[in-house]
Amino acid sequence: MANGRMSMYSVASEGLGGPRAGQQPSQFSTTTLLNAIHNIYLSSQPFKLDAGTSLVVNTWLTASQTGPDGRTGGTIDAALGARAWEHARRRAEDGCIVLGSLHTSCPSLLTPFLSSLPLSLPSSLYKSLEAIQPFLRCSTPYNPSTPRQIALGVTLTLNLTGSLRGAAIALSQGGIDSTKGLLNIPVEAGYRAFDVFYYLLTSASTPAEREFLGLKSASSYALLAKSGTYEPPSYLPTADDAAAADDFRSALKDIGIKGSAHRNLISTLAGLLKLGDTLDYNLDEDVFDEICEDVSGLLGMDPETLATQCTTEDRATLVGGLYEALVDWVISKANEAISAQMVRIRDGTESIGGGGARTPTSNGEDDTVCITILDIPDPTLGKALAMRGVFDDTLGINSEMIADGVEVSAAGSTVVREMQAAIGEVGHELGIMTSATGRDRQHALEKREEVLEKIGHSADEDAFLKKLLFPITGQGIDLGRAGRLDLSSLLSSSRVWYHLSIHPTDDSPASLAALPSINSAWSAGTVSRQLRSWRLPEWANRRNKNLDFTADFDIDEFVQRYALLGCKDGREGIETWILERGWTNGEVVVGKERVWVRESAWWEAESMLDMKPLDSNLPGMGNVMAVNNLESGYSANGSGYFPTPMLDTTPNGSRDHLIAHQRNFSQGNLSQHTLAHNAAMRAPSVAPSGMRNVQAGDYGLGTKGDTFKGQVFYNNEGEFVGQMDPEIADGKHVEEKTMDKDRRIWVAIVWFWTFWIPSPLLSFVGRMKRPDVRMAWREKLTLVWFIVLINAAIVFWIVAFGKILCPNFDKAWNAKEVAYHTGENDFYVSFRGGVYDISKFWKIQHSDTAIETTKENMMPFAGLNMDDYFPPPLPLVCPGLGIAPTTTLQYNNTPEYVIGIHKSGILADDRTSALGATDWYSTKLLPKMREFYKGDLVWDKAFINSDGQNNDHMWVIYNGGVYDLTNYFKTLKVFQRVDSVNFLNADIVSAIESNPGEDVTDSWDEIVKTAANNATENASVQNSLNCIKNLFYVGIPDFRYSARCQTNNYIMLAMTIILCSVILVKFLAALQFGSKRRPAPQDKFVICQVPAYTEGEDSLRKALDSLTALQYDNKRKLICVICDGIIVGAGNDRPTPKIVLDILGVDPKVDPPALPFKSVGTGSEQLNYGKVYSGLYEFEGNVVPYLVVVKCGKESEQTKSKPGNRGKRDSQILLMSFLNRVHHRAPMSPLELEMFHQINNIIGVDPELYEYLMMVDADTCVREDSLNRLVSACANDAKIAGICGETGLQNDDKSWWTMIQVYEYFISHNLAKAFESLFGSVTCLPGCFTMYRLRTVDKGKPLIIADGVIRDYAVCDVDTLHKKNLLSLGEDRYLTTLMTKYFPSMKYKFIPDAYCQTAAPESWSVLLSQRRRWINSTIHNLFELMKLKEMCGFCCFSMRFVVFIDLFGTIILPATTIYLGYMIYLAASSTGQFPIISIIMLAAVYGLQALIFILKRQWQHIGWMIIYIMAFPIYSFALPIYSFWNQDNFSWGNTRIVIGEKGNKQLVAVDDEGFDPRSIPLQRWDDYAMANNLPGRRGGYMEKADMGYDDQYEMDEIRSVYSSVRQGSVLTGMNRNNTYMPPQSPAPFGHMVRASGAASPYHHDQAMANRQSMASLGTHDINRGQTPFQDFPSSRPSVSNLRGQANPSPGLGANRSQSALGLNRPHAAAQSTSSFDFQRGNMQGPDDSMIIEAIQGVLREVDLDTVTKKQVRALVEQRLQTGLVGERRTFMDRQIDNELANM
C-alpha cells in the first residue's frame, strides 16, 4: 500500500487533529448547539460538530463579503477540507465532502470551498464552474441564486503525495429540475428561469447574433413571461445581466466553446425558448407552424416532426430533456478543457495556476485517490443522505463497526422513523426505485427517452442536435447515466465528510440588505427548526460518543505503519502501545479484525511518525519526508520553502497558528533543539530542492544550464519545456485600485486623443488582446503625437512662424543689402521699387547694337539702382497730363556708367534698334524684369523723414509706398516751372513741398476727395497720382523692424543667447587644466555592488579584478555581487552565478540554504529566495572580502528559464533595503539576516560602518585610483549625495556601431555631465559607475537608503506605460530623479578624474535596444522632473531648470535633424537668406568641443568626431523615432493585467496566488543572534566578554541558523592564534546598559573561545584597539593609566578585533558619525573618562599650531558622536585647557 505520509510541517496542525475524546461536551442539546451556532455566526467562523462534520451559517450577504480568512463566498471550514485531503493521501482512501444546505436560502459554497482546499487547482476548473452555473441557477424570492440541480460534484484525483492529477465535474443521475427552472416557473413575482436565457437576451448579444437567432425581449417568450420578472434582484449590489453575460461568454470561450460550438449552443438555447411558445394550447395554427419552422431551423431537424408527430406534452418533455442534454454537453466540454490543461501541467508546458509551477512528480504517480466535493442544494435530499449515513446501522461504515465488535448505541426510534421518512421522499435519487416516487420517476425517464429518440432520429445527420442526444455513436439515448454521479455508490465507497450550511432567518433576502451589519439577521426559531429537522443534537451526541472514528486499519496494517513508533505485532502489541501513548479506549478501539482510531489520536500518531527522522541520524532535514522524496522540512508541500497560505483558517487551525506551531521545530529554535544531538542538522536548509536534485559540486545551484549552451529549452527533469503564452492566462480575479489624480487626468487626455480608434480594431488587427496592452499603445500614440507636435512646433517656430508674423521678411532688401549681391552668380539690382536677381540674364547678349554684353561692361552695375539708367518716355507713363513726347526730366544724380543708359522711343540714341519702339519700356522691359523679381526695395522710415527734412530730398510716403519726386522738382527748378514740365496737379505738388520725407496719405486722400466733385480737377488729380506711381515709385518703408516682424527674432535671440551660454558654460566646465591632484588615501567603508545577469566570464573577471585592484584599503571595501537569477547568458556554457563563484574560487561543494526575501515583483513574484556566499578574493596581491547573493527563485520557478530573475532594480533594492534595515535596526528577512551575519561575523565589519555604495556593472572595468577619488570628493563636500566618473569604451574599434559611440561617450561626460555637475544637478548617475552616500554626515540621515527612495524605487505593480519606462528601462536615471526629489538640497556631481571603461553595444540591434531604453527613460523622467517643486525656482531662474531644458533637447532631436537638413538645403540651393547665425552656432558647438579635446591633447577624438558627425542622422533621427514609437515594446507580465480604467478606479485582473508578507519571517538581528547564540549583537545584550578559553572557536561554530555550510573561499596557512572579538555596537555608548563581564548573567553562556582566522590582512592598531569606545569596559585601562600610557601592552587587545576572515574589526574611533544610532540616542551619555580620552586622541592627531579650541571641541564631539551641553560641555572645555597645559 502506498504511503501518502508527508512531513510534520504539512497542512495539519494541532487544529486538524481536533480535541481528544474527553474534551467534547458530554451532551449536546438544541439549546447548547443553538448558542454555539449563534456565537460562530457572529464571528463568521465554522463550528466543528464532530471530527467529520462542520456547521457554518451563511446568507447571500455574507457570501458577498470578504471573510476573516480573506476569502469571499461565505464562511467555510477549510480545516475540514484539509482533514479530508490528509486522510485521502495518507490512507489512500477515496473521500467525499458533502456540502449540504439546511435551508433553501443558503448560498452555494462549492466554489469557495474548492478554493480553500490545500491544493493548487487548475484555472480551467474555476472557469468551467463559472460557465456551468448559469445553466443551473435561477432567481427566486427566497434565494437570488437558487441551484436547480439535484447534485453537482467535482471529483479531484490525487496521487499519494497529495498532488492533483486530474479533476472532473459531473451532475448526479437525478440531473436538473427543469420543471421549476424552466417549464413551470411560478407565476408570482421574483421567480426567473435559468440565468443563461437572460444572458442570451441581453445587450451583450451582437446585432448579427440577435438577427440570426431572431431574439426578442424576455417578455415575448412564454417560458419567461409567467412571473413577469425579467431583471435580477435589485438588492444585489452586482446585479447586472449584461455584465454577467460578458463574464459568461468569456468563461465559455475559455473552456473551448467558441466559434461553431458557441453558435450551436446559443442556437439550441434560442430554439428552446421558441419551442416553449408551442406549449400554449390556444396557439394559432399559423403561428404554431411558423414557430416550428424557426425552431427546426435552429435545431437542425425536420419541422414536420415537431408539428405533427409531437404532442404538447412531448414538446414539453423535449424542452426539459434537450436542455439537460445541452448542460451535459457543456460539462463534457468543461471536463475536456480541464483534462487538456492537466496534460499540459504534467508535461511541464503550463503551470497549475498560470503562475509557472508544475506539479512535481513523485513515486506515487501510478496510485491515485479521489476526493469528491458534492454540492447538494436541496435540504430534503441532503437531510436524507446525511441521516442515512449517521443513523442507519444497517449500511456503510456503521454496520462494519458493529460487525467488528465496536459497541454502538442504537439510534432512537423517533430519529430512525424520521430518517426513513426523509429517505422515502427522495428514494429515487438514491437509487431506490421500488417506492411510488421511484416508479413515477422511472416512468418519466422512459417517456423522455422515447421522445428524445424520436427527435434525434429526425435530426439532420450532421446536426448539433444529434450530437447532443447521441453523444456516443451507435448507442441510443443515454441521458442521465453517462458521465453522471451515482450518489448511493459514491457515498458507500468513500469516507464521507459533512459541511452543512445553516441560514439564520426566514426573512426574505431583500430585507437583509437593510440590516446594520452582515451578521445582524438571526432568528433562533428558524435556526432551531433547522437543527431539529436534521437531528443535529442527536447527530453530535451519537457520533462523538460512538462513531467519531475517522481512520480504521487492519491489524497488520496498523502494526506495519506505526512500527517505527514502537508498535509491536499482534493485538496485544497494539494494545500495549496504545497504553504507552496514553490513549483511552474511547480514542482507539481494537476490534476483532480492525483498529478504529479517532481523529485526534490518528493525527497524533501521524505527527509522531513525521517527526521520527528527527531522532534518527539521517543526513539532515532533507529526509524528513523520505517516503515522498521531498527534501525540506519547512513547507506544507515539501517544496523546501516556507508554508503557503492554503491552510486551516479556524481559530485553532489558522495559518498563523500553524507557523507558531512549527516554530518549535524550525528556524532558530530548531537549531537549538537539535544541535546537541546532530551537528549535521544544526542549520536546516531551505534550498529549493523539491523540484530538482542538487548534486555536490553545483554550489547548491543545480545543473540547470550547464549543458545547454545558452538554449532556452530544458529537459523534463523539472526543467522548462516549450514557450509560455505571454498574453493569455486563466483563473483571474479582479482587484480594484484607486488611481491618483495625475493618472486620471492622463487617462482622460489619452482617450481624448485616441477615442477615434476602436478597441476591437486594436484587438483583432493590432493583435493586442489585453486591455492594458491596448491602453499602453494608446498612451504611446498620444505621447508620440505630443512629441510630433513639439517637434513640429519647434520646426514651425524656427522656419515658418516668423514668416507668418512677417510674410515678406525674406523678400525685402534695402539699398545697402542689394549692394552686397555683386557676384557673377549673385547679380542683384534694384529698379522702380523692386529688387531683381538678373544673375542668369546679364551674361546673355541682350543688345542689338554694337555694345557687347561682357563681364567688364556688366559687373559695374551689380548692386546698383537702375532707375536713372532706364528713363521711360513721359507720355507713356504719365498719360492724360498733356506731356510732349520730347519732354524729359533732369536727374539730380548723373548716372556713372553712360553705357548703361537705355533711352527708348523718340529719345532713343539709335532709332533703328529695338529701343526705338515707342512702347519698348512697357512691352519689353517691364515684363522681362518681372521674371527676375525677388522682392521689395525698402527704406528706413526714419531715414526717409530725416533725409526729406534735412537734405531737401523730395520723397514722401503714400499708402505704404515711397515716392521720390526729387528729379521732378529739379526739373521744375531748372526750367522755372514752365507749363511743359509742370504737369502734375498743383495741390499734390504743394503737399509734397510742404511735407518732404513724411507720410502724405491723409493730405493726398483729402485732395482726391475734394477733387471728386469737379470732373476736370478729378481727372488732373487721378492722372497725376497715376504718373507718380509709374514714374516715381522707389519702394516701401522698411517693415522688417516693426514689432510684428521683430518679435520672433527677439525670442530666437533670447533662446540663442541661452543656448550659447549653455554651450559656453559647458565648454568652461570641461576645461580643467593642470595636473590631476592625487587625493590623500581615504579610510571610509565602501560597498562595491556588482549586479550580474548574463555577462560572460571575461567581462566578469575583468570587473572583479579591477575592483580588487583598486588603490584603496582592502579591508574597507566589500565587493558585493548580486546574481539576478540562474540564467545562462548567450555564449556561456553555464549559469552566470556559477561563473561568478568559479572566478571567486568558491568550493563547488558549498551549498548554502536558499533563504526567503521580498523581491520587486508582482503578486507571488514578491517572494524570492537567495543564497549567500562570502569569502576573500585575491588578485595581484590584493585580498578583498566579497559577498555573493544568488537569487535562485521559488520552487515553482525552477521549471522556468530564469528562476529568481527580477531585474537589475531588484538587485539594487535588495542591497538598499538591507542597508536601510541595518540603519534603522529594523527586523530583517532570513536572507538579510544571513547577509548581516556574513558581513558582521565572517567578514568582520559591522554593516552600519559602510558609508558609501558604489554601483558598478559587471562588464565595467574601474581604473585603480577612481574609488579613492570619488570618496575624496565626497569627503571634501558633505553635500554630495551621489557622484559619478567618466565612462569610456573598452571596445571602441570592434565595429562601426562602437566607433560612432566613442565621441558621444566622451562628449556626453566632459560636456553634458560636467555642465550639470557645476550646479550639483547631474540628472543621470549611470548605474555602470556611480557612488552614493548612504547617510548625511551631520545628522546621519539616510540618503540612498531612505524609506521614501526605496518605497518609490521598489514599486511592484509596474502596469502602466509610464512606470514601465521609468522602472523597467531607466532605473539609473529614475533613481537619480528620486534622489533629487527627496534630497533637492544635496549635490549630484561628476568628476572626470575617476574613470572606468565599459563595453558598448557592438551590433545595430543591441544599440537600438539600448538607446530605446535610454531615450524613452529620459522622456518619462522629464515628467517626473517637472513635478519637482525645486525644479524651476523663482521665474524659472534655477540651474536645475537649465539642466531640464538641456534634457528637453532629447525630445526635439528629430526637429534638430530636420532643421539642419533645411539649413543645408538653403545653403546649397540659395533659395533663401543664408542662415549665417545658425551656421555660426553649429561651428561654435563643434568648435568648442574640438577645442576641449585638443587642449586635453586627445587627438584621436578628431577622427571620432568626424565619424560621429557622419552618424548624426542615426543618433538624432533614426534612434529617437524608433524609440518614440516603441515605448510600449515590453514583455507584459500576465499575473496582473489592467483590464480597465474609469473615473478614479483601476481594475486589475490578478492571475496569481498573491503574496503573503507572512511567508517571509522577519526578525531583528539582536533577537536572532541571541536566539541562535551568534556573536555580533549590537546593543541591549551582553556581548562576549574578553575571556580566555583553551579551545578554539571554529569557523563552523559561528554560522547563522540559515548557514549549514562553510564560507565560500578561504586563504589557508594563516595565523591560527588570533583571538576572536565580537563585533561592537556602532552606538558608542551601547555598553553602558550592559553588565560587566564579571556580573553578566550571560557571562559563561556566551563566552566564546579563540577561533581560527581564515586570513590575516594587516596589523592591528593597538592604540585604536584600546579606545574607550570598545565594548570591553572591564578591560579598559583606567584614566590615570591612559594619560601616561603611550603604548599599552599588546596583551590588552592586540589582534583580538579580527573577524572570521581575519579582517581587523574597526572600532568606534574609526567610525563615521553617520553610523551613529539615532533611534536609541546616547543612552546615558559619555562619562568623564571617555571625554578625557577623546580629547587626548584629538590632540594627538591635530596640528596644535593651527587648530583652534572651537575646532578641537567639534572634533571631540564628533569622536564621541554626540553633542555635549551643560555640565558636560563645561567639563570638556576645562579638560581641554588642562590637557593643553600638560603638553
Curated annotation (Swiss-Prot):
SUPFAM superfamilies with a match to the protein in the record: Cytochrome b5-like heme/steroid binding domain (SSF55856), DEK C-terminal domain (SSF109715), Nucleotide-diphospho-sugar transferases (SSF53448), P-loop containing nucleoside triphosphate hydrolases (SSF52540)
Enzyme class (EC, first level): transferase
Deleted gene: phenotype: Reduces the content of chitin in conidia walls.
UniProt topology in membrane: Multi-pass membrane protein
Boundaries of every DEK-C domain copy: 1725-1781
GO molecular function: ATP binding; chitin synthase activity; cytoskeletal motor activity
Glycosylation sites recorded in the entry for this protein: N159, N637, N652, N664, N669, N1014, N1018, N1416, N1529, N1617, N1695
Pfam family, one: DEK_C
EC number: 2.4.1.16
Listed transmembrane segments: 745-765, 781-801, 1051-1071, 1441-1461, 1474-1494, 1502-1522
Localization: Cell membrane
PROSITE patterns, per database record: DEK_C
UniProt region (Disordered), positions on chain: 1659-1724
Catalysed reactions, semicolon-separated: [(1->4)-N-acetyl-beta-D-glucosaminyl](n) + UDP-N-acetyl-alpha-D-glucosamine = [(1->4)-N-acetyl-beta-D-glucosaminyl](n+1) + UDP + H(+)
Assigned keywords, A-Z: Cell membrane, Glycoprotein, Glycosyltransferase, Membrane, Motor protein, Myosin, Transferase, Transmembrane, Transmembrane helix
Residue spans of biased composition, Polar residues class: 1664-1688
BP-aspect Gene Ontology terms: chitin biosynthetic process; fungal-type cell wall organization
Role: Polymerizes chitin, a structural polymer of the cell wall and septum, by transferring the sugar moiety of UDP-GlcNAc to the non-reducing end of the growing chitin polymer. Responsible for about 29% of the chitin in conidial walls, is essential for conidial wall strength in media with high water potential and contributes to strength of hyphal tips.
Family membership: Belongs to the chitin synthase family. Class V subfamily.
Protein name: Chitin synthase A
Gene: chsA
